[in-house]
């Protein structure tokens, strides 16, 4: 993956990292390497790496234990062999309030509160030939319309990168992790893995596929990154409460930018794809989440982007507000995670200055 323009510009602020010293490690999903249902500043890291290092992380789906999958028609040979020991090996007392089995936390040794942790999504692999989708009784965006539970198994074609939803209905796959986050502030305690917040977490943002870059304000020593809730695909809204839930392995690179969250006044995560800048907002109220996402994009365009990259156009807040209204998209991310999510996508193609256009 080629780093994005802003990521390239931002690297001038990160700790000096020797290329020779960079390492790649693998973190499998086992009873001792997962955080079941929570993010926490008090969690003990299962792996510690350094700024610039890469970690390959194996993750579990939210489809449930092997017996549930078999009851829905999945052949035992199609279920990862490590899933049963995972479910049997994590005591109830060690589980948090949420339902996601997250791999991690991974500590980045240099990260401290006030820093920005940059996470580059380098690779995502589909690990099984099936996904599940389902809703519980009274769950999802229309609980009164569907007062019962329903689950289905959906075959995946990993070669064609499609899902066979039904005869005559084929869904293109765009794998991503529904949950990618760091520890929230210590005062949040053991934060439920379901609602996204200022730590990121269960953002369920389908834009965050391979090639995306996330920027988190660090709240705890080590940052404590976790990932899981693999999706083979999803529609904006995720209205029945699940996507094409599946097993993914992700390759992530971590880069620490010392003091940048303090200097930028960055309070909420933001992201980039190869084609867009992304701001996010999360709230129990959809209007509030939308206001947050729009304000975060205004702040990025008018205050943060040029400060990081002098080639970025200088925009007033008035101009940034107008640019969002005339050329950017405000999208619902999801409507089912307690806190609704909204994101603003600002296309990089808008910025046509010669120096911007010449950058990789």
Write out the residue ranges for each language-model feature.
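N-terminal, Lys/Arg-enriched amphipathic/low-complexity engagement segments
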Residues: 27-95
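A generic structural signal for residues embedded in beta-strands
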Residues: 57, 116-119, 216
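Short, Lys/Arg- and Gly-enriched loop/turn segments at beta-strand edges
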Residues: 62-74, 124-134, 222-232, 334-336
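Bacterial N-terminal signal peptides
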Residues: 7-18
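Intrinsically disordered, low-complexity linker/loop segments enriched in Gly/Pro
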Residues: 97-101, 107, 122-210
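Short alpha-helix capping/helix-loop boundary micro-motifs
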Residues: 38-44, 100-106, 198-203, 299, ...
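Conserved mixed alpha/beta catalytic, RNA-binding, or beta-rich assembly cores of soluble enzyme
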Residues: 175-202, 206-284
């Amino acid at each position: 993956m080629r780093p994005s323009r802003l990521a390239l510009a931002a690297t001038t602020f990160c700790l000096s990292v020797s290329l020779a010293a960079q390492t790649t490690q693998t973190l499998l999903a086992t009873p001792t390497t997962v955080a079941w249902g929570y993010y926490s500043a008090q969690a003990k890291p299962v792996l510690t790496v350094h700024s610039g290092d890469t970690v390959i992380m194996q993750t579990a789906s939210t489809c449930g234990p092997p017996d549930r999958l078999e009851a829905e028609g999945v052949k035992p040979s199609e279920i990862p062999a490590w899933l049963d020991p995972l479910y049997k090996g994590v005591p109830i007392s060690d589980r948090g309030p949420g339902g996601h089995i997250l791999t991690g936390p991974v500590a980045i040794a240099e990260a401290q509160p006030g820093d920005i942790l940059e996470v580059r999504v380098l690779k995502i692999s589909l690990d099984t030939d099936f996904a599940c989708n389902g809703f519980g009784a009274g769950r999802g965006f229309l609980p009164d319309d569907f007062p019962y539970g329903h689950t289905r198994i959906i075959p995946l074609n990993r070669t064609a990168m499609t899902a066979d939803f039904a005869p005559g209905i084929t869904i293109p796959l765009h794998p991503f992790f529904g949950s990618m986050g760091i520890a929230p502030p210590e005062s949040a305690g053991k934060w439920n893995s379901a609602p996204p917040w200022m730590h990121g977490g269960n953002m369920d943002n389908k834009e965050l596929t391979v090639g995306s870059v996330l920027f988190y304000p660090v709240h705890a020593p080590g940052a404590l990154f976790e990932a899981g809730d693999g999706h083979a695909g999803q529609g904006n809204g995720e209205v029945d409460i699940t996507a094409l839930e599946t097993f993914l392995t992700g390759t992530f690179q971590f880069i620490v930018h010392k003091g940048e969250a303090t200097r930028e006044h960055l309070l909420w995560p933001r992201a980039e794809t190869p084609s867009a800048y992304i701001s996010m907002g999360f709230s129990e109220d959809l209007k509030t989440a939308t206001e947050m996402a729009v304000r975060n994009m205004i702040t990025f365009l008018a205050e943060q982007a040029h400060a990081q990259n002098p080639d970025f156009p200088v925009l007033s807040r008035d101009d940034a507000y107008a640019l969002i209204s005339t050329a950017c998209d405000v999208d619902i991310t999801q409507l089912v995670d307690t806190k609704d999510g909204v994101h603003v996508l600002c296309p990089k193609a808008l910025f046509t200055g010669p120096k911007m256009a010449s950058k990789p």
